[in-house]
């Protein structure tokens, strides 16, 4: 079985070892069945399971496989029953015990969630805590369904199952990803077991690009189906990262920068080119989760996405489709040879030449964003923000500015933040704090410059988009306000201020349906508080 890992989301790999799922040999009779499951051929796997149980009703391997099929179908309680029956016959099999544990833990989580549906997806989320996510999640997934279908020519016939874990323990239970995986490698989503899983953005300080992560996971689902689960990790990850924003952004012109070239990714690629130190496609196996640092993980995604950029520039949409189809019957090097007419080594060399020719430039102040699981303490976010400031002098001055602002002295706080910027001029945290206090003093125009600079360094900060929304709202630039506030929802959808502003904005631009949705969301957030 081949699998792949991704920044902000990981396709299942060797991480299941903690559950013992790979701890024993697979019964040869069901090896093909496992391959059917992991390539999403669920109906065929179900036929095999039914036939096997019918012929050998007291066969532990047959009952175990029947449990796996039910698990992949989302029938978790029935899966537990099948695993129990198998364990009653042979209780020593660690792999079987692992599957039973995973099924039981998943059932314990999912039974607390509400089911939501759209034409092509079934979503499970905690209604009380995460119910506001459902309409945004399903809208994103439906747009991804259409955009990726147009790009790659695949539309799943069955509804795709999606699960949003409400917190880190629940996410660990259903995905096997740990707290370390989230905070050290950015693993907040996973595609496995015939479904997509992410952790709620509410569970992380400052949120994350959760809707793009859903689209990213859906891409993995599509790639598995199109390649019969034979795509190598670099292709999996590269395609998922390259296409994950297609649901919200049109295909850029041929000579324009693709969306994967974020400030951090550009900087990492520039450094890799200068030092000739790449992660390399082979080192991405068996999973990016095993790379040592967040920077290595992010560089791996940047390399993989740029390889897809290279393929797309040279072979276009048809080339990507042919590559995936060819992988169903040939190895990766053979597929490269067939599609590109060159060896895999030549492909890698040409890709690096392509990168050199892009004229990438490092972005001063950019760095890999690290995720942090939120605690129950409000001050935790302030502590996390301060730790993001690398300069000790800037950190001290920022902390002093916070204390001064807490005493109601906005003008003095602004001066202190400006002093902090002298020591760390590209810090998004300080730039945002300065902009926020300027807005507080109704100096909206002055807030634009620090916010633009913050966005240039870090385009994934919800705070920057919220403050820009306030600036545009005050100036009655409602279309611009709409754009940045909707961007904030895509990162941290739990800020009531965003929806207060959006109610005004949607009303002003004449969008009654969105106005109603924003009002409902605002009411739910304020009532919950």
Give the positions of each predicted feature:
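Helix-start (N-cap) detector for alpha-helical repeat units in TPR-like alpha-solenoids
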Residues: 25-27, 60-61, 94, 394, ...
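Register position in tetratricopeptide repeats
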Residues: 38-39, 72, 106, 406, ...
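Amphipathic alpha-helical substructures
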Residues: 43, 72, 77, 251-297, ...
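Structural marker of alpha-solenoid helical repeat scaffolds
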Residues: 55, 89, 423, 457, ...
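Juxtacatalytic substrate-recognition/specificity segment
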Residues: 110-236, 243-253, 263, 270, ...
């Amino acid at each position: 079985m081949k699998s792949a890992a991704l920044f902000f989301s990981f396709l299942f790999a060797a991480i299941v070892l903690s559950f013992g799922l790979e701890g024993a040999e697979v019964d040869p009779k069901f090896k093909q069945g496992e391959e059917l499951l992991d390539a999403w051929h669920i109906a065929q796997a179900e036929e095999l399971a039914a036939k096997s149980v019918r012929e050998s009703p007291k066969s532990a391997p047959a009952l175990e496989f029947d449990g796996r099929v039910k698990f992949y179908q989302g029938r978790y309680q029935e899966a537990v029953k099948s695993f129990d029956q198998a364990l009653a016959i042979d209780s020593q099999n660690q792999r079987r015990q692992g599957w039973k544990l995973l099924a039981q833990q998943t059932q314990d989580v999912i039974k607390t969630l509400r089911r939501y549906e759209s034409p092509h997806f079934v979503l499970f989320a905690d209604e009380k805590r995460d119910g506001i996510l459902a309409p945004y999640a399903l809208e994103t997934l439906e747009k991804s369904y259409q955009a990726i279908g147009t790009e790659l020519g695949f539309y799943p016939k069955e509804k795709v199952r999606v699960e949003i874990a409400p917190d880190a323990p629940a996410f660990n239970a259903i995905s096997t990803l740990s707290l370390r995986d989230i905070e050290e490698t950015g693993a907040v989503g996973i595609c496995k077991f015939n479904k997509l899983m992410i952790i709620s953005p509410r569970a992380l300080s400052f949120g994350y690009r959760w809707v793009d992560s859903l689209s990213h996971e859906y891409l993995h689902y599509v790639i598995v189906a199109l390649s019969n689960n034979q795509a190598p990790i670099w292709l999996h990850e590269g395609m998922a990262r390259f296409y994950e924003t297609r649901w919200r952004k049109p295909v850029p012109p041929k000579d324009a920068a693709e969306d994967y070239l974020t400030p951090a990714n550009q900087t990492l690629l520039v450094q890799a080119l200068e030092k000739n130190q790449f992660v390399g496609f082979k080192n991405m196996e068996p999973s990016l989760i095993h790379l040592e640092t967040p920077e290595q993980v992010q560089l791996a995604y940047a390399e993989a996405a740029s390889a897809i950029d290279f393929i797309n520039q040279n072979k276009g949409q048809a080339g990507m489709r042919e590559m995936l189809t060819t992988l169903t019957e040939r190895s990766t090097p053979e597929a490269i040879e067939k599609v590109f007419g060159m060896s895999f080594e030549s492909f890698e060399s040409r890709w690096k030449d392509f990168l050199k020719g892009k004229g990438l430039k490092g972005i001063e102040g950019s760095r890999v964003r690290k995720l942090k699981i939120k605690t129950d303490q409000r001050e935790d976010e302030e502590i996390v923000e301060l730790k993001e400031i690398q300069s000790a002098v800037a950190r001290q001055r920022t902390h002093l500015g916070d204390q001064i602002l807490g005493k109601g002295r906005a003008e003095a706080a602004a001066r202190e933040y400006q002093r902090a910027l002298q020591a760390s001029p590209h810090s998004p945290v300080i730039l945002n704090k300065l902009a926020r206090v300027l807005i507080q003093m109704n100096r909206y125009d002055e807030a634009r410059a620090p916010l633009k600079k913050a966005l240039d360094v870090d385009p994934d900060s919800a705070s920057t988009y919220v403050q820009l929304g306030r600036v545009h709202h005050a100036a009655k630039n409602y279309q611009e306000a709409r754009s940045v506030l909707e961007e904030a929802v895509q990162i941290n959808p739990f800020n009531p201020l965003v929806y207060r502003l959006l109610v005004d904005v949607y009303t002003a631009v004449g969008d009654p349906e969105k106005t109603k949705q924003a009002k409902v969301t605002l009411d739910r957030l304020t009532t919950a508080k």
